């Protein structure tokens, strides 16, 4: 559920988009989560204005408009403009969307739907269409939170109840903010991959694979007053210097930026920057089904063999936050007893390796997606940092389009450099995907963990920080002590925009692979 959302508790092969959207803001940036492009006045709004939004479509879109067929969670940033979910996510809460309210117990959830909401073709959103949407999206292997829904009861046309097969209401609630909870018109399902019927603020106008996705305003949308754009053009911009150039030349009006481009973008006089803190983090996942990482003592040693602060400074220009544990300090999952314990101590790591029966060190292969400066630079630094501790790491680059099959299905590599996306208030969500039997990554990498699973299962019953916090603090401490993952950097969400063209209050989304289009507009003239 991450991203607030869903179950994608792992974020499927989202193709890692080279961190192209989130990594930037340090403490100075985090002072404000929004940036005022200009005061919103009716006289300055161009109701036909089209926002040109830069995105790497080649690496972050699944080439289908059917959420049930998506294999890349980064498609969410486009899908969320086309489809409303039942709920929406903030960093610490879930909020109404197509459901105006809900009541829940650990094993059931009842949603009250928004009266009068329709799809773009005029069909109403009802309990029947919600059930059909869930049944359709549930067929995806990536939407595993939906497998918790045992049965669905249509109480009346605007009320629907989910009965769950486990006490995991918190997890399912978050799933309802994400791809899992997106609402599709069952009458349009046969053509949804190419001609979707929208339940969101925009409809599809045209699509050129790898080039552009053009959307226009959905004039039947229930909350159309919140959206002042005539449309949105998602246009292809590859990560790297092209992002800076696209902003500078006006080829795009808005885009997420990479860490290495922050200084150049900030120097542009007509560009504004908006930031939002996020739980997104860069992480090394290890394959624990075989040597060397089937030994928890080897994994534990590696926690002291990486210089998180050094990576933050060298790769992220000091703008991220070193991840000494899986949860940032501003969340209920942060464990004060762990704190910043796992600093770079290569001599200690080497001694731990020797004590585990490896006096001459261990060798392993780290897989990274090709074509990403951020991942490439991070991997090279990791290679140098790990060597004094006795970890001999080789780097293998794989095309982003092949990562999913090569690494997770075919078992290539001993570890992979990837990214976990925010799950908003559902702190347990990523751990569910990584370490429980239901999680895709946990199954494919052999990382299921019998010690962590009971803590995760208990936490999934509720989104309350008082429930999840103590459990995930304990789980995080265990994860670090046994090296179940190697968190590296927390990455705030950052978007840049053309101040001459974009008006309203620009708010960066709560994490990568998202877009926030409400309240902004294109200026007249």
Annotate each language-model stretch with its function.
Residues 354-422, 465:
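Ligand/substrate-recognition segments at binding pockets and active sites
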Residues 54-106, 197-198:
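N-terminal lobe/hinge region of extracytoplasmic solute-binding protein
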Residues 208, 306-333, 374-383, 408-525:
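Detector for C-terminal structural segments
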Residues 52, 126-132, 157-163, 200-201, ...:
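Alpha-helical secondary-structure segments
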Residues 220-265, 392:
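Ligand-site clamp/hinge motif
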Residues 72, 92, 176-226, 231-233:
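Gly/Pro-rich hinge or "lid" segments in bacterial periplasmic/extracellular proteins
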Residues 321-355, 372-375:
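Structural transition elements
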């Amino acid at each position: 559920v991450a991203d607030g959302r869903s179950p994608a508790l792992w974020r499927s092969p989202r193709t890692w988009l080279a961190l192209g959207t989130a990594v930037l803001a340090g403490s100075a940036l985090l002072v404000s989560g929004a940036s005022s492009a200009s005061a919103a006045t009716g006289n300055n709004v161009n109701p036909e204005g089209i926002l040109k939004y830069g995105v790497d479509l080649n690496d972050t879109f699944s080439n289908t408009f059917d959420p049930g067929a998506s294999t890349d969670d980064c498609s969410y940033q486009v899908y969320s403009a086309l489809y409303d979910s039942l709920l929406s996510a903030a960093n610490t809460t879930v909020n109404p969307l197509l459901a105006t309210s809900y009541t829940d117990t650990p094993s059931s959830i009842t949603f009250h739907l928004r009266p009068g909401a329709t799809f773009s073709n005029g069909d109403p959103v009802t309990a029947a269409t919600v059930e059909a949407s869930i049944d359709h999206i549930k067929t995806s292997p990536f939407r595993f939170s939906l497998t918790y829904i045992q049965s669905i009861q249509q109480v009346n046309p605007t009320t629907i109840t989910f009965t769950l097969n486990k006490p995991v209401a918190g997890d399912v609630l978050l799933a309802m903010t994400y791809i899992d909870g997106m609402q599709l018109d069952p009458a349009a399902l046969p053509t949804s991959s190419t001609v979707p019927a929208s339940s969101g603020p925009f409809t599809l106008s045209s699509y050129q694979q790898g080039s552009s996705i053009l959307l226009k305003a959905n004039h039947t949308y229930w909350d159309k007053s919140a959206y002042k754009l005539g449309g949105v053009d998602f246009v292809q911009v590859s990560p790297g210097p092209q992002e800076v150039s696209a902003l500078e030349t006006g080829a795009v009006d808005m885009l997420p930026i990479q860490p290495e481009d922050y200084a150049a973008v900030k120097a542009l006089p007509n560009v504004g920057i908006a930031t939002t803190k996020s739980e997104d983090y860069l992480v090394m996942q290890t394959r624990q089904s075989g040597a060397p990482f089937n030994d928890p003592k080897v994994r534990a040693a590696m926690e002291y063999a990486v210089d998180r602060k050094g990576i933050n400074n060298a790769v992220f220009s000091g703008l991220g936050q070193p991840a000494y544990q899986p949860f940032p300090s501003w969340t209920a999952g942060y464990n004060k007893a762990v704190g910043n314990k796992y600093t770079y101590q290569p001599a200690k790591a080497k001694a731990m390796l020797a004590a585990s029966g490896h006096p001459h060190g261990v060798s392993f292969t780290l897989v990274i997606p090709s074509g990403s400066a951020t991942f490439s630079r991070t991997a090279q630094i990791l290679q140098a940092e790990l060597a004094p501790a006795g970890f001999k790491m080789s780097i293998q680059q794989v095309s982003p389009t092949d990562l999913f099959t090569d690494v997770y299905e075919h078992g290539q590599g001993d570890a992979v450099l990837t990214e976990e996306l925010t799950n908003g208030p559902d702190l347990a969500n990523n751990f569910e995907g990584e370490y429980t039997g239901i999680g895709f990554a946990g199954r494919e990498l052999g990382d299921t963990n019998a010690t962590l699973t009971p803590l995760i299962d208990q936490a999934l019953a509720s989104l309350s920080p008082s429930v999840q916090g103590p459990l995930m603090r304990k789980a995080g401490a265990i994860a670090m002590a046994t090296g179940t993952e190697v968190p590296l950097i927390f990455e705030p969400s950052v978007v840049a925009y053309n101040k001459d063209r974009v008006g309203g209050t620009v708010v960066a989304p709560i994490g990568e692979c998202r877009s926030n289009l409400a309240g902004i507009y294109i200026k007249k003239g």
